[in-house]
Curated annotation (Swiss-Prot):
PANTHER family: SPERMIDINE/PUTRESCINE IMPORT ATP-BINDING PROTEIN POTA, SPERMIDINE_PUTRESCINE IMPORT ATP-BINDING PROTEIN POTA
EC annotation from Swiss-Prot or TrEMBL: 7.3.2.3
Organism: Photorhabdus laumondii subsp. laumondii (strain DSM 15139 / CIP 105565 / TT01) (Photorhabdus luminescens subsp. laumondii)
Binding positions for ATP per the UniProt entry: G35, P36, S37, G38, S39, G40, K41, T42
Gene3D superfamilies, A to Z: P-loop containing nucleotide triphosphate hydrolases
Top-level lineage group: Bacteria
Name of the gene: cysA
Stated name of the protein: Sulfate/thiosulfate import ATP-binding protein CysA
Subunit structure: The complex is composed of two ATP-binding proteins (CysA), two transmembrane proteins (CysT and CysW) and a solute-binding protein (CysP).
């Protein structure tokens, strides 16, 4: 079941929270709505569910206009962040609830309901918890019950509002993998809201990055990560180091140091320079592409790499994050090095300049 969102806007009073949103979600696709608080992602999800009404625009499911259709008629399953389980009902009864309140002509008999519920509990690995109450479950177990309940009525579309936000990091990681596997098995169309970049990157087929009621970028996790469409996306997705610089001719000046470029950019003057921690080069001696002196202040092993924090010596006031991969010569605290990078993203205000490479030789 595909979802077509065409020019949807939403106002709460005089405040606009969605501005002319257009987005297509393909059948069987899992899409993440990713953005900071106030970006409009939950409002958009609730409009798809029928829990909010758009001010303008059209919403269609597989070509059928559902803009005015009641939520109960949309065949949409909704999973909330805080589970919304019935405390007085057992796990079995919570999962069965949606089936028991279907219109009589669509309602299965009790034997069919029991069979369906037990199949779902087996799928979410909670068969032995059927007679327990929500108060007897962990957070991760409650969320799996909520997901089974949403799937019980065989929705065409599954919507999830920060489904793992209330769980600790380890449980979130396990449930993300489990949800991805479940999606690949059942092939339902799904849209989920998150502010967790790692969650969006790991689970989604495509990521929709939102900001202040607008869509900044839509793409696969690899596309939005490698080719950010705006400065906001660049800064929002993952850790990035930010330096103030200036372009003079074919030189990039950072903290009084001259870094030669392989071209002479059209733009001259002040720029903001962005480098990801793993794009930073670090050498014991200064080079053309690594002329900036630093001192190592923190070394944190992370399995197959080391996360370093280095303090610039006289050219930048904030510490710089660096990822180090060479296990044969791991830096120690107090060591002095020189950093730079052959690839940097440069912005003049919000305008992205062409990605520039530092010259390797004079």
């Amino acid at each position: 079941m595909s979802i077509e969102i065409n020019n949807i806007s939403k106002y709460f009073g005089r405040t606009q929270v969605l501005s002319d949103i257009t987005l297509n979600v393909f059948s069987g696709e899992m899409v993440a709505l990713l953005g900071p608080s106030g970006s409009g992602k939950t409002t958009l999800l609730r409009i798809i569910a029928g829990l909010e009404q758009q001010t303008a625009g059209k919403l269609s499911f597989h070509g059928q206009d559902v803009s005015r259709m009641h939520a109960k008629d949309r065949q949409v399953g909704f999973v909330f962040q805080h589970y919304a389980l019935f405390r007085h009902m057992t796990v079995f009864d919570n999962v069965a609830f949606g089936l028991t309140v279907l219109p009589r002509r669509r309602r299965p008999n009790m034997a069919a309901i029991r069979r369906k519920v037990m199949e779902l509990l087996e799928m979410v690995q909670l068969t032995h918890f059927a007679e327990r109450y929500p108060s007897q479950l962990s957070g991760g177990q409650k969320q799996r019950v909520a997901l089974a309940r949403a799937l019980a009525v065989e929705p065409q579309i599954l919507l999830l509002d920060e489904p793992f936000g209330a769980l600790d990091a380890q449980v979130r990681m396990e449930l993300r993998r489990w949800l991805r596997q479940l999606h690949e098995e059942l092939k339902f169309t799904s849209v989920f809201v998150t502010h967790d970049q790692e969650e969006a990157m790991e689970v989604a087929d495509r990521v929709v990055v939102m900001r202040q009621g607008n869509i900044e970028q839509v793409g696969t996790p690899q596309e939005v990560w490698r080719y950010p469409a705006s400065r906001f996306v660049m800064e929002f997705l993952g850790e990035v180091n930010h330096f103030s610089g200036e372009i003079k001719g074919s030189q990039l000046l950072i903290g009084g140091q001259h870094l030669p470029l392989n071209v002479t950019p059209i733009h001259q003057g002040n720029v903001d320079v962005f480098l990801r921690p793993w794009d930073i080069m670090m050498n014991s001696q200064p080079t053309l592409s690594s002329p900036l002196p630093v001192q190592v202040t923190e070394v944190s092993p992370r399995g197959h790499f080391w996360q370093l924090s280095v303090q610039p010596l006289g050219w930048h006031h904030e510490s710089v994050a660096v990822v180090w991969f060479d296990e044969t010569s791991v830096p120690t605290r107090g060591n002095r090095y020189f950093i730079g990078g052959t690839e940097a993203r440069l912005y003049a205000g919000d305008k992205q300049l062409q990605t520039l490479s530092l010259a390797q030789t004079a």
